[in-house]
Amino acid sequence: MTTGRFEPGKLLDFFTWFDKTNSNHLAAVALLQEECEAIDPDMMSDYASWVRLYRNKTSPAVSLKFTPQLFEKLTGYPARRFDPEFCHDCAYLFEETGFSEHLEPSRMLMANLMHESSNFRYLKEIASGEAYNGRLDLSNTEPGDGPKFRGCGPLQVTGRGHFEAFYNWLRDSEGIDDPKIVELGTNYVAEKYPFSIAVNWINRNNLLQVCLEDGFDACCYRINGGWNGYPDRINKYEICRKYMK
């Protein structure tokens, strides 16, 4: 067998010749894994986007890729602002809520995420959260729960109850036991799980179905409960329609 120079972008061709009985091939793949994990520890995890797609037995209807370059186009901020963990968590949200299978609803959701967070500039509520202390409807039963569990992520998920539900869901569904979610609250989750903290809220509110059946305006209303910032949401929706393909 004659092999030519490996060209960037032809990783699939490279693995066509992979021989699991060849010790050099095995060592090379092990080295590749080490280098991938050095770049991004989550790249080889069970919930990484490419791993989930690889294991999926059905063909995806939409092939959205959440990359730093896409976020640069959507927000106008430089790509370096959006690290791999941020992009992975965004992809995780869209996959776990079913949005990744529907292009137009994905654009609707992204536009609202962008508006609610000022293009992902604010992933923690600016207010102190003191006003949420003692709010039983948020399950804030402990002193200091208000600031600890103030608005988190692009959708500003708020309250001990939501954080405990997210912790339980992540442990039971994904096998990820991360007690810091409840121990540290918003300051930790906004960095580690800015998007996935909203999975439960989106699913409980049937947001995908709302988008599919009733469209963009209904999506905005379900998220906002009104029409605050509607012109900006529309503007961001048009940006998403231009770049999310």
Where do the language-model regions lie?
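Alpha-helical structural motif
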Residues: 67, 86, 149-150, 162, ...
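Generic structural signal for residues positioned in beta-strands
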Residues: 153-156, 197, 222
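Internal mixed-charge
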Residues: 193-201
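A structural motif
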Residues: 147-176, 191
